[in-house]
Amino acid sequence: MTNIRKSHPLMKIINNAFIDLPAPSNISSWWNFGSLLGICLIFQILTGLFLAMHYTSDTTTAFSSVTHICRDVNYGWVIRYLHANGASMFFICLFIHVGRGLYYGSYMFLETWNIGVILLFTVMATAFMGYVLPWGQMSFWGATVITNLLSAIPYIGTDLVEWIWGGFSVDKATLTRFFAFHFILPFVITALAVVHLLFLHETGSNNPTGISSDMDKIPFHPYYTLKDILGALFMMLILLILVLFSPDLLGDPDNYTPANPLNTPPHIKPEWYFLFAYAILRSIPNKLGGVLALVASILILILMPMLHTSKQRSMMFRPLSQCLFWMLVADLITLTWIGGQPVEHPFIIIGQLASILYFLIILVLMPITSIIENNLLKW
C-alpha cells in the first residue's frame, strides 16, 4: 500500500514541498531564512488577528484602543509587542534573504527572483500601513509625508494623493482604508509566497558554489526540517529577549503621543527598516528626483540578472566581488544610520555620498569587477 502522504491529493503537495523534496547537500545556514520568513508571516497574521479583535480604526479611538490592548486585555501587551517587534524580525530575515540571493547568484532563477521583489514591495507597503494604525504622532506624520510623495508624479499627483487620503488630509477615511489594506495584504503575501515556492521547486534550490547539485541531493526531511527548527528557535529567542526586556528599543517615543495635525514632530522618520530608503530619498533636493531614487533603490533588484557579467554564478570564488558586496552592506548600514539623523551639515553630505555609492556599486562597479575576474581567470 502506498504511503498516505504520497497518495492523498493534499498531502502529496505538502510532501513534495517539505518532506521528500530533493535538496542540495551543501546549503548553509544562509538558506534558513526562507523558512524563517514563512514562520514570521504566520506569526504576524496570528498576532495581528488578535490585535484586530480589540483595535478600532477610528481617529478618535485608535490611539485609546491600542492603549486599552496594552493595559486591559489579557496579555495584550505581549501580543502588541510581539507583533511590532515581529515586523523587525521579518525585515531582518528579509534583508538577509535578499542579501543571500545577491551573494550566491540566486537571482538567476528569474521568476522566483521577480516574485521575490514583488513580495518585498508588498511587505514594505504592509509594514508602512501597519505603522500608521496606532495613530501616534509618528504614525500620522509618517503617513502624511510618505503619501505626499505621490504628489511629485506630474499631472495626476495631487489628485492621486487626495484619492488615497479619501479627503484633503490624512484623516478618518485614510486610517480606515489603511486598516483594511493592512489586514488583507498579509494574505496576498501568503499567496505570493506559495507562487514563489512553486517557481523555486521548478528549478530546485541554488547552493553556495553556484554549480548544479543534481548529482548530490538529500531529502529535505529530516536534514533541513531539523536545521530550520534550530533557526526558528534562535529567532524566537532573539524576539522574546527583545519583547520582554526592551520592547520599545526599535520604536519611536513620539508614537506614544496621540496624533496632532497642528503639531509637527521635530524629526519625522519611519521605522528602522525603511531608513536606508528614506536616506536616499532625502539626499536628493528635488522632490520628484528623490521619489524616483527611492523607488529605484528597491526596483534595482529586478536588474540584477541583467547586470550579472561573471562566468561564475556565485561570489564564493570571486574575492573582488566579495569586497564590493560587503562594501554595499556597509553602505546600507551607513544609509540606515543617516536616515535617522537630522538634516544638517555632516549628515547631508554623508547621505548623498552613501546614496551615490549604493547605485555606483550595483550598476557600475560590480559588473566591471566581474569582467575583470573573468579575465584574471582567462575565461
Swiss-Prot record:
The chain crosses the membrane at residues 33-53, 77-98, 113-133, 178-198, 226-246, 288-308, 320-340, 347-367. Keywords: Electron transport, Heme, Iron, Membrane, Metal-binding, Mitochondrion, Mitochondrion inner membrane, Respiratory chain, Transmembrane, Transmembrane helix, Transport, Ubiquinone. It holds the Pfam family Cytochrome_B. The keyword Translocase does not apply. The keyword Membrane applies. Gene3D superfamilies: Cytochrome Bc1 Complex, Chain C (1.20.810.10). A ubiquinone binds at residue 201. InterPro entries: Cyt_b/b6_C (IPR005798), Cyt_b/b6_C_sf (IPR036150), Cyt_b/b6_N (IPR005797), Cytb/b6-like_sf (IPR027387), Cytochrome_b (IPR030689), Cytochrome_b_C_euk/bac (IPR048260), Cytochrome_b_N_euk/bac (IPR048259), Di-haem_cyt_TM (IPR016174). Its main location: mitochondrion. One of its GO terms (cellular component) is mitochondrial inner membrane. One of its GO terms (molecular function) is ubiquinol-cytochrome-c reductase activity. Its cofactor is heme b. The cytochrome bc1 complex contains 11 subunits: 3 respiratory subunits (MT-CYB, CYC1 and UQCRFS1), 2 core proteins (UQCRC1 and UQCRC2) and 6 low-molecular weight proteins (UQCRH/QCR6, UQCRB/QCR7, UQCRQ/QCR8, UQCR10/QCR9, UQCR11/QCR10 and a cleavage product of UQCRFS1). This cytochrome bc1 complex then forms a dimer. Heme 1 (or BL or b562) is low-potential and absorbs at about 562 nm, and heme 2 (or BH or b566) is high-potential and absorbs at about 566 nm. Component of the ubiquinol-cytochrome c reductase complex (complex III or cytochrome b-c1 complex) that is part of the mitochondrial respiratory chain. The b-c1 complex mediates electron transfer from ubiquinol to cytochrome c. Contributes to the generation of a proton gradient across the mitochondrial membrane that is then used for ATP synthesis. Belongs to the cytochrome b family. This is Cytochrome b. It comes from Potamochoerus larvatus.
